[in-house]
A protein has these predicted regions:
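Conserved substrate/cofactor phosphate-moiety recognition/catalytic segment
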Residues: 1-40
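Hydrophobic/aromatic beta-strand patches that form the interior of the parallel beta-sheet core
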Residues: 12, 53, 76-78, 124-126
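Generic structural signal for helix capping and beta-alpha/helix-loop junctions
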Residues: 19, 62, 85-87
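Amphipathic alpha-helical transducer elements in NTP-driven molecular machines
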Residues: 28-39, 61, 81-84, 130, ...
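Glycine-rich phosphate-binding loop used to anchor ATP phosphates in small-molecule kinases
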Residues: 29-74, 97
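Short glycine-/polar-rich loops that comprise or flank the Walker A/P-loop
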Residues: 71-76, 119-123
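Small-molecule kinase domains that catalyze NTP-dependent phosphoryl transfer to phosphate-bearing small molecules
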Residues: 81-84, 89-139, 146-155
Length: 160
């Protein structure tokens, strides 16, 4: 939707980033390293784009707060909720299947000792096994509209 409105958008997939950096573990140290690496990469490129959208599992408050501090009012989180049952059903990478067989350990939300650490920061919550893609994406677009109004002087993006 943003590209259709001629915004320059960069999408970053945390899993692809993880592979490029050859980070294969899901322990706390590796998660922090991967998330900080993504944040530092974004810091180098964000001025070239109107929006940088990152999809990454970021369960640790420390890294999310670091990103918020680094990017300030240009940062907001989308917390995606989904049941393990639904995640397993959708799992195109077969991560949950591998986790069930202990091929992968510490898969966040499944067999991990790492839990999601809550922050006081207000974020968008989308519940992808209870909401349609349209409802979830509209929540994000509404936040972007608000963000644009605050930062750019009452401009409103219209998405249908």
């Amino acid at each position: 939707k943003l590209r259709k409105k001629n915004f320059k958008v960069k999408k970053i997939d945390g899993d692809i980033f993880r592979k490029k950096n050859k980070t294969t573990k899901f322990n706390k140290k590796s998660i922090i390293e991967n998330n900080l690496s993504i944040i530092n990469y974004i810091d180098k490129i964000h001025n070239n784009y109107d929006f940088v959208i990152v999809s990454v599992i970021s369960p640790l408050k420390k890294t999310r707060e670091y990103a918020k501090k680094k990017f300030g009012k240009n940062y907001f989180e989308v917390y995606t909720k989904c049941s393990i049952r639904e995640l397993t059903r959708r799992d195109t990478k077969k991560l949950y299947e591998k986790a069930k067989k202990n091929i992968i350990t510490n898969l966040i939300g499944f067999n991990s000792s790492i839990n999601y650490e809550k922050t006081k920061y207000k974020k968008i919550i989308v519940n992808t096994d209870k909401e349609t893609i349209s409802v979830s994406s509209n929540k994000v677009i509404e936040k972007i509209n608000l963000w644009v109004k605050v930062l750019a002087g009452k401009i409103k993006l219209q998405f249908m």
